[in-house]
């Protein structure tokens, strides 16, 4: 039976982990065991936060819409309900952008919903 030498594969695997650990602090960037643990943790956090980012932005949009709606004499829930009843289809991202960049247009939307 022929002898199997695995040095290249093992080195490639370790270097892949150490390349992923670039930018980490201390031994976490150049000691394989700790780097491996840190990389696994970082990948878990990245996976979790990709899902969390969507929730966070939706919360931000809702709070911006609510703040602008209160300036115009209503609140978020009444505004969204009025938009559904009057069949105005604008998503929360666009509403928040309008509230920030074009307050006059947002004010017209609020007045058309409340009437």
From Swiss-Prot:
The keyword Chaperone does not apply. One of its GO terms (molecular function) is structural constituent of ribosome. One of its GO terms (cellular component) is ribonucleoprotein complex. Pfam families: Ribosomal_L20 (PF00453). GO terms for biological process: ribosomal large subunit assembly; translation. The keyword Cytoplasm does not apply. InterPro entries: Ribosomal_bL20, RIBOSOMAL_L20_CS, Ribosomal_protein_bL20_C. Keywords: Ribonucleoprotein, Ribosomal protein, RNA-binding, rRNA-binding. HAMAP family: Ribosomal_bL20. Binds directly to 23S ribosomal RNA and is necessary for the in vitro assembly process of the 50S ribosomal subunit. It is not involved in the protein synthesizing functions of that subunit. Belongs to the bacterial ribosomal protein bL20 family. This is Large ribosomal subunit protein bL20.
């Amino acid at each position: 039976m022929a002898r199997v030498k695995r040095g290249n594969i093992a080195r490639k695997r370790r270097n892949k982990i150490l390349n992923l650990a670039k930018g980490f602090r201390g031994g976490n960037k150049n000691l394989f065991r700790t780097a491996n643990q840190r990389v696994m943790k970082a990948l878990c956090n990245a996976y979790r936060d990709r899902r969390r980012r969507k929730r966070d932005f939706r919360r931000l949009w809702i709070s911006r819409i609510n703040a602008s709606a209160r300036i115009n004499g209503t609140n978020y829930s009444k505004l969204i309900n009025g938009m559904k009843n009057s069949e105005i289809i604008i998503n929360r991202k666009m509403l928040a952008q309008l509230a920030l960049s074009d307050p006059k247009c947002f004010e017209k939307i609020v007045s058309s919903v409340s009437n």
